[in-house]
Amino acid sequence: MTGLAGRTALVTGTAHGIGAAIADMLETEGATVHRVDKDTLDVTDGRAVETYVSRVGGVDVLVNNAGGVCGQTGRPLEEVSEDDWRTVVDANLTSTFLCTRAVTPGMKERGWGRIVNISSGAGRSVSLTGIQAYASAKAGQIGLTRQTAHELGPFGITVNCIAPGFVLSNPTTQRQWESYGEDGQAALVGGIAVRRLGAPEDIANGVRFFVAEASSWVTGQTLSIDGGHAIF
């Protein structure tokens, strides 16, 4: 398929899993894809992000996928340090703001743009991780999606969001899954309408919908892709 032929895309958090699947999908759609991860670009550093986008020469499609729990585990609120909080919020929410800010001038100039933020079911309900900063940052991404969609819509730019359910996509989610044990795993799958965990390609397919020309009248939305978990 060549629906994005001639377009340039930037995807953050592409080392594996969801980000890699999204980048692969965009390439099959004909886009020139720039893949970045923490080893190639610090997306919490505004100057570095601006420099990277300038060097790329313009971004038509931005997928803010970078983030995660940053090696943290759920702890009582009183045991969470300010540094712990900032690390997770910066990785998930601040990075989304910085990357969006960097690509906006070029999108405005060209009169076209697609921005998709990868949030989480943790941004819409209680997080399975138990990490307060993660739940807060993911909810913040949803709010940022609405606000920027309202601001950028007149310039031909749509901004949407995906809230994935439990996707086995990286070593962290694999460890989390294994920690549940057989009973916990059965309970989790039993709470998913289609009775299976998500795959990275499920999320990539949601991004495919949002970046398509046919979705030009869809903006400010958050799509839960969770196998029906949110309906329980």
Regions inferred by a protein language model and the residue ranges of each:
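Substrate-binding pocket helix/loop in short-chain dehydrogenase/reductase
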Residues: 73-77, 81-89, 184, 188
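Short C-terminal tail/terminal secondary-structure segment
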Residues: 125, 207-208, 219-232
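Short, small/polar-rich loop/turn modules that mediate ligand/substrate recognition or access, typified
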Residues: 153, 158, 163, 218-220
